[in-house]
């Protein structure tokens, strides 16, 4: 049995970025752990999730939820084991996931989006990916907003990231042609040869328009947009009449001081002429329906035989580096940070 320490190592925000997020915006610090109050429990975190939404939490501009301030522990989802408890709901030894922040130890009362993990679904860290936020995002974004039909073409930006990979799997499961838009020729090859996409395009290609036309010979019916920026403008030209655009992320503007500076060609004419439907999407709107996504994704994985890949960085001190590399697009699959005392599956 682990003996809880008097303090926990945490990743603390030392400055808000003006431009690209970098490791200098964070510092590793010790924060004291107080005694548990009634209803609380203590979690030893084993895994931290690194997600694109973290960009918005570090912006000073208004957003859909409160961000972080200088001196705060950086926000993040995590998975860990309950090591001490004053709660009737969470027992010693339970594995849980929640919005615990970038820290090794967390005190909670169950209100930080905490839920117990079913080990039968797979390794516990999958609660941060396919059976967590990424899965909810991909499933409900595609199925509820995109509403793909068999035989349609579904394109997804950040196509070999945690959400993009799942969008591809779900779309293929429903009989769609799948096209990954990625950031390198190596990822193009991986997307098609090992990750199950029908075609892939390098967004940095000098002949992007031609590449999109070749990858999507019948046009694009559903575009799952994780990036925004110039790439959105390019894909827009290939949308079919009646197409649907899911606005899920804006990682292409992560380098800007303010996202309002991300201004490209106006899209109103294309939306009008092609009768497109463009809708913003937040996974948190569907959190109460998470079991629906989990059940479907478990079925897809059983039929496909493999879990999506993970990109793991070791050590809490490396969490800022993991965030930076994810924003650069260096990862293939779910970006995770392992901080546990031992590998637990």
Language-model features: where?
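Short amphipathic alpha-helix with an adjacent loop that forms part of the alpha/beta core around
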Residues: 207-218
């Amino acid at each position: 049995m682990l003996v809880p320490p008097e303090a926990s190592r945490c990743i603390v925000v030392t400055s808000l970025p003006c431009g690209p997020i970098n490791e200098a915006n964070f510092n590793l610090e010790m924060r004291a752990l107080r005694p548990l109050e009634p209803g609380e429990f203590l979690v030893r975190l084993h895994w931290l999730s690194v997600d694109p939404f973290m960009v918005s939490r570090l912006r000073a501009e208004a957003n859909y939820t409160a961000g972080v301030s200088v001196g705060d522990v950086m926000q993040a989802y995590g998975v860990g084991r309950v090591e001490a408890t004053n709660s009737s709901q969470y027992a010693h030894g339970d594995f849980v996931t929640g919005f615990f922040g970038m820290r090794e130890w967390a005190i909670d009362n169950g209100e930080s989006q905490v839920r117990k993990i079913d080990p039968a679904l797979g390794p516990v860290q999958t609660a941060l990916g396919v059976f967590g936020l990424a899965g909810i995002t991909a499933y409900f974004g595609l199925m509820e907003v995109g509403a793909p039909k068999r035989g349609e073409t579904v394109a997804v930006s950040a196509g070999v990231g945690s959400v993009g990979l799942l969008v591809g799997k779900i779309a293929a499961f429903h009989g769609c042609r799948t096209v990954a838009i990625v950031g390198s020729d190596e990822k193009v090859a991986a997307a098609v040869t090992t990750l199950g996409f029908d075609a892939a395009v390098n967004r940095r290609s000098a002949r992007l328009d031609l590449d999109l036309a070749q990858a999507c010979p019948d046009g694009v019916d559903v575009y799952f947009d994780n990036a925004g920026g110039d790439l959105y403008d390019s894909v827009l030209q290939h949308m079919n009449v009646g197409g649907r655009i899911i606005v899920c992320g804006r990682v292409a503007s992560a380098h800007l001081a303010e996202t309002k500076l991300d201004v490209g060609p106006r899209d109103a004419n294309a939306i009008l002429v092609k009768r497109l439907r463009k809708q913003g999407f937040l996974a948190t709107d569907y959190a109460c329906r998470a079991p629906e996504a989990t059940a479907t994704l478990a079925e897809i994985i059983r039929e496909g035989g493999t879990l999506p890949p993970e990109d793991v960085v070791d050590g809490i001190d490396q969490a800022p580096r993991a965030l930076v590399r994810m924003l650069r697009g260096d990862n293939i699959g779910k970006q995770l940070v392992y901080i546990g005392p031992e590998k637990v599956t």
